[in-house]
Swiss-Prot record:
GO MF term list: ATP binding; proton-transporting ATP synthase activity, rotational mechanism
Keywords assigned by UniProt, alphabetized: ATP synthesis, Cell inner membrane, Cell membrane, CF(1), Hydrogen ion transport, Ion transport, Membrane, Transport
Keyword Cell inner membrane: yes
Main location group: membrane
Membrane disposition: Peripheral membrane protein
Entry-linked CDD domains: F1-ATPase_delta
Name of the protein described by the UniProt record: ATP synthase epsilon chain
GO cellular component term of the entry, any: plasma membrane
Residues annotated as signal peptide: none
Top-level taxon of the source organism: Bacteria
Organism lineage string: Bacteria, Pseudomonadati, Pseudomonadota, Alphaproteobacteria, Hyphomicrobiales
Location of the protein in the cell: Cell inner membrane
Length: 132
C-alpha cells in the first residue's frame, strides 16, 4: 500500500478536513500542483480554484477555495484558505440569484467604500458560479 499524505484544510471558521489521503491537487498561484506523500517542501499562495482530494476507494472530494496559502512539509500538507465551500453544496440557480442581487448592490452603492465592497462580493460570487 502506498504511503499516505497527512492533509489539513483550515478556514477562518473551522477545520474543514484533517486526515490521511493519497493525493491533493491544489490551485497554486503558479499553476495546479499535485501533492503526495514525500513531496518536496514548498509554500505557495492559492488562486481561486478547486482543491481535489483523492483517496483510494472513496469518491473524489472537490472544494472551491478563494485565496490562502499552502505549505508542504515532511509532516504533510496544510492549506489555510480564506474561503471554502464544497462543490456539492453549490446550486447554480441560487448563485445566479445572488449575482443579480450583487449587481444591484453595485449599482445602488452610495459611496466608494460600499461600491468596492459590493464589487468584491460580486467578483467572489462570479468565481463560485464559474465552478458550478
Amino acid at each position: 500500500m502506498a504511503e499516505k499524505l497527512n492533509f489539513d484544510l483550515v478556514s477562518p471558521e473551522r477545520l474543514l478536513f484533517s486526515g490521511q489521503v493519497d493525493m491533493v491537487v491544489i490551485p497554486g498561484s503558479e499553476g495546479d500542483m499535485g501533492i503526495m506523500a514525500g513531496h518536496a517542501p514548498v509554500m505557495s499562495t492559492l488562486r481561486p480554484g478547486i482543491i481535489e482530494v483523492e483517496n483510494e476507494g472513496a469518491p473524489r472530494q472537490r472544494i472551491f477555495v478563494r485565496g490562502g496559502f499552502a505549505e508542504v512539509t515532511p509532516a504533510g500538507l496544510t492549506v489555510l484558505a480564506e474561503f471554502t465551500v464544497p462543490l456539492a453544496d453549490l446550486d447554480a440557480t441560487a448563485l445566479d440569484r445572488e449575482i443579480a442581487l450583487a449587481d444591484k448592490d453595485v449599482a445602488d452603492a452610495k459611496n466608494d467604500d460600499k461600491r468596492q465592497s459590493a464589487l468584491e462580493k460580486l467578483d467572489h460570487l462570479k468565481e463560485l458560479r464559474h465552478t458550478v
